[in-house]
């Protein structure tokens, strides 16, 4: 079959659509946010492809797989086995790294196990087991006539008189021994000091180097090796300063005897006990109770709350501190940072062996006196964290925990033996720390010889191929040791994309969700080449995408619309890019053809030089001591290639500092910096990201934006409610009273099907309405609470027109383009872009102070050109109220409308971390060193054709 045929697709908001999609082509599905793109690509095509494959497995195998719901579709023909590569499934496992996800680490383990050279950690001597023949050949190759002696070490650096050993050696017929470097007669050995370390080496043979000595030497070596347990030393008899020859029959260091078991791949795995560092169990970090987090307000007194939970409000712990104060004679009301350092140490780390008289007063007022050392606040927390069975206590204490690099393995995760195996004078941790780009050139330039080259050939090919794929999807700046949980959604998705190309499958349907997220325009071309390569292998590649370059590169485009939510779900246009541009109903086509565009502001808002936010000396991750200057009250854009340091500078440094100083947060530790100036211009900082507004089906736009509370109050105020004595709580589906108890206010009941997907059936009692019959009998303007929650925002705005507080909040949801979602729509069904706009609307609806610092990280993710236009209008509205907006963005439509741009670079990873240029878009566009400028300049020169 040449096509995938879809008939009657009705998943979510799709309106019974029919499609013929060409196979083995690059297909882009585009349209407004919430129009039904993911419903078609993921919830229909991928879900059915995966379901059909899984149904071919046995019932036993199916119970171990997470199954997707059967899509609401009449018929699909021509499907291949499907693989989805989404942004959501980033691993939160601290053991996952870029190297393990891509399987490069597995090949590196194999490489080091097969061609690695182990060395002694203390003496840097290669560990190698030698045969007696090799030892003999080495000695005979010395200059002829040289006088040598063969020694067998029997005692190495051990305390004692060793009388018995010396007597035994003499009894066995040995005449001489070298004791602590001096050769002496065993018939009259020196008296050794008991408390000193001694080395005793028996003289097994003395000889002049000659060619005919081979037989005699072989026998002597065998005797020496048997005596010493596998090591032998050959020393010059005439000149003690000549370097000695060390031999070992074991896989061991000939100097100290350090030995290793045979190299095997599991020794290089930090997820295996054989290779993991025993101190940190292969995590590379150790958790500890951080005094900086525990001491939240060192300028306060212990009584006044310097340590949360230990002040006078917590009687039990406070009386312990009072007893401590009496013992050490310090004032418990004095600021903590003014106390003597020894007292501070005792409070935090304990009194050591000092016993203190503690007075304990029970509930009845009886006093008990006990004497014991004080364990210290930090040790007390650590003990409670380990011993408690309460998840609430553990969660509370976890707030005071920080991570530090493991002291034993220096964060490399591997045990000592694995860290001292070398390939081309480089260890596995050193290779893992290289950026992917540098690692690729390291392996391309690797010169192995002989048998080692033959063994490594196939392994190196696999490593090289996988590194190339990662470079091709724009991830050359990441290191193989980078933890998976620190990756952005776009990075994680592109890593999995590279892994799929490495797998080399053919005849598969790949479904991708915006792979261009987090990717600079410079790297976009390489990503598209990768997708085309995947297609050329013989696969159908379906991409949900808004990026203009991706749409233009597609073989077939499907435009879903015309609007979003209930106004979408139809195929507006499909075919080639030209077909889309020619379709009058297609919004996408209008933006592609230039009939509509996002306008460049005629006049940019200029900065007030007296009001700036200045971050000085930021050095987190790859930042090279940069100073960031942002004008207050403007819309600023932070740009730069992927990995140049944007997130480190804004999220890890600026946001963390502002959160601590403005919002009083203590959880996040800012990345290193010297100084910050200008925070006095702000009263709070808000980060508006694309994380879900709630992780349970009970969370919805009405609860998140605060609309639900006044709605419940309205219902509680109607005469019927007053007569029945109903309070606003009666109209909540989260508490007993008004909700349906059969489904506990969910409206659906989950039925576990084990090897089939779990199904949710509407509750029989309330018919999916969430409330009991009595609650639903109460009507406001003829509608029950269930009917109000089922309204779209647009309908609700009209319905509550006479209630100003509600009308204002509903209007802001319409302003951000969410008129189509339902008030009670489950938060879990909202896309990332929709969740972000719900958050924006909540901010817009607040009575603003005009002194807020807003930080947004790639707000255009999942947004169509028309959605971006609407988002920019909202951001400009916030700016016009006096607020400061800082946006990390790659989208050129956003960048060109900014008042101020800060461009980082020039490259990613170690090649970045510098601020190349700051200024208006026009200033930045002239910077020769900037990759952003190269793409921004033509955008600023485009003549818009606005309609």
Curated annotation (Swiss-Prot):
User: What are the subcellular locations of this protein?
Assistant: Cytoplasm
The alphabetized UniProt keywords are: ATP-binding, Cytoplasm, DNA damage, DNA excision, DNA repair, DNA-binding, Excision nuclease, Metal-binding, Nucleotide-binding, Repeat, SOS response, Zinc, Zinc-finger
What's one Pfam family here?
UvrA_inter
Q: Where are the transmembrane segments?
A: none
PROSITE patterns, per the entry: ABC_TRANSPORTER_1, ABC_TRANSPORTER_2
Gene3D superfamilies in alphabetical order: ABC transporter ATPase domain-like (1.10.8.280), ABC transporter ATPase like domain (1.20.1580.10), ATP-grasp fold, A domain (3.30.1490.20), P-loop containing nucleotide triphosphate hydrolases (3.40.50.300)
Q: Where are the zinc fingers (C4-type)?
A: 253-280, 740-766
Gene Ontology CC terms, in alphabetical order: cytoplasm; excinuclease repair complex
SUPFAM superfamilies per the UniProt record, alphabetical: P-loop containing nucleoside triphosphate hydrolases
Transport recorded as keyword = no
> In its keyword annotation, does this UniProt entry include DNA repair?
yes
**A GO biological process held by the record:** SOS response
Location (main, coarse): cytoplasm
Annotated ranges, domain ABC transporter: 310-587, 607-937
- Superkingdom, natural source: Bacteria
Residues that bind ATP: 31-38, 640-647
- What are the recorded GO MF terms, alphabetically? ATP binding; ATP hydrolysis activity; DNA binding; excinuclease ABC activity; zinc ion binding
Record's function text: The UvrABC repair system catalyzes the recognition and processing of DNA lesions. UvrA is an ATPase and a DNA-binding protein. A damage recognition complex composed of 2 UvrA and 2 UvrB subunits scans DNA for abnormalities. When the presence of a lesion has been verified by UvrB, the UvrA molecules dissociate.
Report the HAMAP family cross-referenced here. UvrA
What binding partners and quaternary form does the record give? Forms a heterotetramer with UvrB during the search for lesions.
In terms of NCBIfam families, this protein maps to: PRK00349.1 (NF001503), uvra (TIGR00630)
Similarity field: Belongs to the ABC transporter superfamily. UvrA family.
Q: In its UniProt entry, what is this protein called?
A: UvrABC system protein A
Q: Which gene encodes it?
A: uvrA
């Amino acid at each position: 079959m040449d096509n995938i045929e879809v008939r009657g697709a009705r998943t979510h908001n799709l309106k019974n659509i029919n499609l013929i999609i060409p196979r083995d082509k690059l297909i882009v599905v585009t349209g407004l946010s919430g129009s039904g793109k993911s419903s078609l690509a993921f919830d229909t095509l991928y879900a059915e492809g995966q379901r059909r494959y899984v149904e071919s497995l046995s019932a036993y195998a199916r119970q171990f797989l997470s199954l997707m719901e059967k899509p609401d579709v009449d018929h699909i023909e021509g499907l291949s086995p499907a693989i989805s590569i989404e942004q959501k499934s980033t691993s939160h496992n601290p053991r996952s790294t870029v190297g393990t996800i891509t399987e490069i680490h597995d090949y590196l383990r194999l490489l080091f196990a097969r061609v690695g050279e182990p060395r002694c950690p203390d003496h840097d001597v290669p560990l190698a087991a030698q045969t007696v023949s090799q030892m003999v050949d080495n000695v005979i190759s010395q200059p002829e006539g040289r006088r040598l002696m063969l020694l067998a070490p029997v005692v190495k650096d051990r305390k004692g008189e060793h009388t018995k050993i010396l007597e035994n050696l003499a009894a066995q017929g040995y005449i001489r021994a070298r004791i602590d470097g001096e050769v002496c007669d065993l018939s009259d050995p020196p008296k050794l000091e008991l408390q000193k370390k001694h080395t005793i080496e028996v003289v097994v043979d003395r000889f002049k180097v000659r060619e005919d000595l081979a037989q005699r030497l072989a026998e002597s070596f065998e005797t020496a090796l048997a005596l010493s347990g596998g090591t032998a030393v050959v020393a010059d008899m005439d000149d003690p300063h000549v370097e000695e020859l060390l031999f070992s029959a074991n896989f061991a260091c000939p100097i100290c005897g350090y030995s290793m078991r045979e190299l095997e791949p599991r020794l290089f795995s930090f997820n295996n006990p054989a290779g993991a560092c025993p101190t940190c169990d292969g995590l590379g970090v150790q958790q500890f109770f951080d005094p900086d987090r525990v001491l939240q307000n060192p300028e306060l007194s212990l009584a006044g709350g310097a340590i949360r939970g230990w002040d006078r409000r917590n009687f039990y712990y406070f009386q312990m501190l009072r007893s401590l104060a009496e013992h050490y004679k310090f004032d418990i009301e004095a600021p903590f940072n003014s106390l003597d350092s020894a007292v501070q140490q005792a409070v935090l780390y304990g009194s050591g062996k000092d016993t203190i008289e503690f007075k304990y007063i029970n509930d009845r007022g009886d006093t008990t006196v006990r004497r014991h050392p004080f364990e210290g606040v930090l040790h007390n927390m650590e003990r409670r964290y380990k011993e408690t069975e309460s998840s609430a206590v553990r969660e509370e204490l976890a707030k005071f925990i920080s991570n530090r690099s493991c002291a034993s393995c220096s964060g490399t995760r591997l045990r000592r033996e694995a860290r001292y195996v070398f390939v081309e004078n480089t260890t596995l941790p050193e290779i893992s720390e290289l950026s992917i780009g540098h690692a690729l050139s390291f392996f391309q330039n690797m010169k192995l010889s002989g048998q080692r080259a033959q063994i490594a050939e196939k392994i190196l090919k696999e490593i090289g191929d996988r590194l190339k794929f990662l470079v091709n999807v724009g991830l050359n700046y990441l290191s193989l040791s980078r933890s998976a949980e620190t990756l952005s959604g776009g990075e994680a998705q592109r890593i999995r994309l590279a892994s799929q190309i490495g797998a080399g499958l053919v005849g598969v349907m790949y479904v991708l969700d915006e792979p261009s997220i987090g990717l600079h325009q410079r790297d976009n071309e390489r990503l598209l080449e990768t997708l085309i390569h995947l297609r050329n292998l013989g696969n159908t590649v379906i991409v949900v995408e808004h990026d203009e370059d991706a749409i233009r590169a597609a073989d077939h485009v499907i435009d879903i619309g015309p609007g979003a939510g209930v106004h979408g779900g139809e195929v507006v246009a499909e075919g080639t890019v030209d077909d889309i541009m020619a379709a009058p109903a297609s919004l996408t086509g209008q933006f592609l053809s230039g009939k509509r565009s996002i306008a460049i502001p005629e006049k940019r808002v200029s900065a007030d030089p007296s009001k700036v936010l200045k971050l000085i000396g930021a050095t987190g991750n790859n930042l090279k001591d940069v100073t960031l200057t942002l004008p207050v009250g403007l819309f600023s854009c932070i740009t730069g290639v992927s990995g140049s340091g944007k997130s480190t500078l804004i999220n890890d440094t600026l946001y963390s500092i502002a959160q601590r100083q403005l919002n009083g947060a203590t959880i996040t530790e800012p990345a290193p910096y010297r100084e910050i100036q200008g925070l006095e211009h702000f009263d709070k900082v808000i980060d508006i990201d694309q994380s879900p507004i709630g992780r349970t089906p009970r969370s919805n736009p009405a609860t998140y934006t605060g609309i639900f509370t006044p709605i419940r109050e309205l219902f509680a105020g109607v005469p019927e409610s007053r007569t029945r004595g109903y309070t606003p709580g009666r109209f909540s589906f989260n508490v007993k009273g008004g909700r349906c108890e059969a489904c506990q206010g969910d409206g659906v009941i989950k039925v576990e099907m084990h090897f089939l997907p779990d199904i949710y059936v509407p509750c029989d009692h309330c018919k999916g309405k969430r409330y009991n019959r009595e609650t639903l009998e109460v009507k406001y303007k003829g509608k029950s609470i269930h009917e109000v929650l089922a309204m779209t925002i647009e309908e609700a705005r009209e319905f509550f027109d006479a209630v100003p507080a509600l009308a204002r909040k509903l209007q802001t949801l319409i302003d951000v383009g969410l008129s189509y979602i339902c008030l009670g729509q489950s938060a879990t069904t909202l896309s990332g872009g929709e969740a972000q706009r719900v958050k924006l609307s909540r901010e817009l609806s607040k009575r603003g102070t005009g002194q807020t610092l807003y930080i947004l990280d790639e707000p255009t993710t999942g947004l169509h050109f028309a959605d971006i236009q609407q988002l920019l209008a909202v951001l400009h509205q916030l700016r016009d109220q006096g607020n400061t907006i800082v946006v990390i963005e790659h989208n050129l439509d956003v960048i060109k409308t900014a008042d101020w741009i800060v461009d980082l670079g020039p490259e990613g990873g170690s090649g970045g971390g510098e601020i190349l240029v700051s200024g208006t878009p026009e200033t930045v566009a002239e910077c020769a060193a900037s990759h952003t400028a190269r793409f921004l300049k033509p955008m600023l020169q485009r003549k818009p054709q606005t309609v």
